[in-house]
Amino acid sequence: MAKLAFVKRVLESTIEAELKRRVEATGGICEKVRAIGRRGFFDRIIILPGPRIIFCEVKRPRGGRVSEHQSGYASHYEALGVPVAIVRNREDIDALLKS
């Protein structure tokens, strides 16, 4: 009988915790946003040395979809010249910290 391969599901909260840890390791701030009445607003506001401010949406690596509301916020903020990031994994965190 063949063995079944189980893939560990990575939760959004796991990615979010890693993002916070890595941002704070650079001396930055990674604030959780609770925007009451603002459906689809970003999960985190990141402030990095420089200063650089980035609005960030965190999604789980597999199956985490950006909603229409979230996409709308991202498009609007980017049109205003505000950096926006969608983070799904460690590679995305690396890219955010290097940009």
Pin down the residues of each PLM region.
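Catalytic phosphate/metal-binding cores of nucleic-acid and nucleotide-processing enzymes, i.e., regions
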Residues: 1-99
